[in-house]
Swiss-Prot record:
<protein>
    <recommendedName>
        <fullName>UPF0111 protein CT_691</fullName>
    </recommendedName>
</protein>
<dbReference type="InterPro" id="IPR018445">
    <property type="entry name" value="Put_Phosphate_transp_reg"/>
</dbReference>
<dbReference type="Pfam" id="PF01865">
    <property type="entry name" value="PhoU_div"/>
</dbReference>
<dbReference type="InterPro" id="IPR038078">
    <property type="entry name" value="PhoU-like_sf"/>
</dbReference>
<dbReference type="InterPro" id="IPR002727">
    <property type="entry name" value="DUF47"/>
</dbReference>
<comment type="similarity">
    <text>Belongs to the UPF0111 family.</text>
</comment>
């Protein structure tokens, strides 16, 4: 709690940004995780999945600490409700990453040439959507200093629009993946099919929550 008090003393957004870095540490493992799966290195998949779970637990603990600290009456120049919602959405991103990682340990899955390239494109766009909103949140303390006005605020609104566009691109890629999996020419076992569907849904959850987070940040800036 003393660490959080110090962070809040720097900026009301500093704890959110510290939490964001833990969330980012779960998202950033996804590419190495799926690369290990592609190579058939299931031992590394297990190690990386444990890493994601560890980082998610840390993020969850910090989220709870921030919530308690916000209830302590610390002065804030923005709505407590807004900050609580932002950190809750951020935490849901780490939850999605952990869910995906756990699914990869349920069964020794494999990539198929029919969807491998499309899948990594989908994953890349999804990570980009998160990185865009993360960039916005890292700017929030600077925006506070400038009363959310000027070029920085305009830049943030552009980034929010970028997240929305990336989420739409993710939706289109997800649709293309669905077409592959439901094609009459594509043969995959039932267990593998179910797991891949859940994995794709989990990845989609990251882009959806990134867009939701971007809009909430934008609303917070507009309310100021």
């Amino acid at each position: 709690m003393q660490v959080l008090a110090s962070l809040f003393g720097q900026s009301p957004f500093a704890p959110l940004q510290a939490h964001l870095e833990l969330v980012s540490s779960t998202i950033n493992v996804l590419f190495p995780l799926f690369s290990a799966l592609k190579e058939g290195d299931y031992e590394r998949v297990g190690v990386l999945a444990q890493l994601v779970s560890s980082k998610e637990r840390q993020a969850d603990g910090m989220k709870n600490d921030v919530r308690r600290h916000l209830a302590s009456g610390v002065f804030l120049p923005v709505s407590r409700a807004a900050l609580l919602e932002i950190i809750s959405i951020q935490d849901s991103l780490a939850d999605c990453a952990e869910d995906i990682a756990i699914l990869l340990t349920v069964k020794e899955l494999q990539f198929y040439p029919e969807f491998e390239e499309l899948f990594f494109e989908f994953l890349q766009k999804t990570v980009q959507s998160f990185e865009a909103v993360a960039k916005t949140i890292r700017e929030m303390d600077r925006l506070l200093e400038s009363s959310f006005g000027g070029n920085r605020a305009d830049k943030t609104r552009v980034l929010v629009s970028e997240v929305s566009n990336l989420e739409h691109e993710c939706d289109l890629l997800q649709r293309e993946l669905m077409k592959v999996f439901f094609s009459d020419d594509f043969a995959i076992g039932t267990k593998g099919f179910v797991l891949w569907m859940q994995i794709i849904k989990g990845i989609s959850g990251i882009s959806n929550n990134s867009e939701k987070l971007a809009y909430r940040v934008s609303m917070t800036l507009e309310e100021k």
